[in-house]
Amino acid sequence: KSYEFFLKKILKKYSGSYCLAAASKDKGEVSFNIHPKHMEGSSLLKEEIGVKADGFEIKVPTIKIDDLVNDKKLKKPFLIKVDVQGAELDVLRGAEITLQATEVIVLEVSLFKFMKGAPDFYEVIKFMKDHGFVTYDILRGCYRPLDKALGQVDIIFVKEYGIFRKDHRFATPNQLK
């Protein structure tokens, strides 16, 4: 409900609908940690730095993206953007069928395990490769204040044999002149 005001505001400008739930690999209910001072850091997972950083907990329903796509009769192809503070693979595990009709996935990927139970960089890359996706581009990075090390990046994944990888040349002959 914390975000519902913003969702309603968006729907005044654009047509669509929303579902107040956490995307996950299973349908059910989970504990969700709300960070009142930085809502974008709210997560299903606990912070590695301790309970003071976890904020307060609420119960939220969970849905599978596959069920949402089926129930809403959404038309393919899909572009999926997931930024859920370390629970990205759980979201994608609930979208196994939808992934087959998806050409582009944008994921926030951490280079450190900031959240308990979060996958590391390699696990995300391997999961995506196992599901037929490869890295296409790496977008903005976020550096951790602790030591200025690269902490997170947004990675664009595309189908390995999809429309964005039909041509493997570096450049055309004209571009190299």
Locate the predicted segments by residue.
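Phosphate/nucleotide-binding beta-alpha loop and adjacent structural elements of enzyme active sites
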Residues: K1-K177
